[in-house]
Amino acid sequence: MALSKDDILNAIAEMSVMDVVALVEAMEEKFGVSAAAAVAVAAAPAADAAAVEEKTEFDVVLQSAGEKKVNVIKVVRGITGLGLKEAKDLVDGAPSTVKEALSKDDAEKAKKELEEAGATVELK
């Protein structure tokens, strides 16, 4: 009489860890396969999920310059190193990305400086 999948699973569930390891090794030898490849493939989506949860690079996006446009232009020049005309064009073109791929601390610092100058800023 052939065993069903449930019978096999129940038998494996009752085995000790050492017996399961020995069973896996015997199956690898018998069928010429490796269980390690299946584990690596199964682990990949979990790594992607962790990367989504812990974002490491941020873009500082200027939504609007607010009332104090001149102060915002000065801060943009300080953050980006742009010339006066380029910084003014960036501020006038809001919403626009001020700086890309910053660490969380640097992005928060830039956001704080811009908000203190009167701008509305978003981190993406």
Swiss-Prot record:
CDD domains with a match to the protein in the record:
Ribosomal_L7_L12
User: Do you know which SUPFAM superfamilies this protein is assigned to?
Assistant: ClpS-like, Ribosomal protein L7/12, oligomerisation (N-terminal) domain
Q: Which Pfam families match?
A: Ribosomal_L12, Ribosomal_L12_N
GO BP field? translation
Query: Positions of the region Disordered?
Result: 101-124
Query: What are the protein's GO molecular function terms?
Result: mRNA binding; structural constituent of ribosome
Q: Assembly state and interactors? A: Homodimer. Part of the ribosomal stalk of the 50S ribosomal subunit. Forms a multimeric L10(L12)X complex, where L10 forms an elongated spine to which 2 to 4 L12 dimers bind in a sequential fashion. Binds GTP-bound translation factors.
Q: Which NCBIfam families match?
A: L12
Family per record: Belongs to the bacterial ribosomal protein bL12 family.
Please give the HAMAP family that the UniProt record associates with this protein. Answer: Ribosomal_bL12
Q: What is this protein called?
A: Large ribosomal subunit protein bL12
Which species is listed as the source? Hahella chejuensis (strain KCTC 2396)
Q: Tell me the lineage of the source organism.
A: Bacteria, Pseudomonadati, Pseudomonadota, Gammaproteobacteria, Oceanospirillales
Per UniProt, what is the name of the gene that codes for the protein in this document? rplL
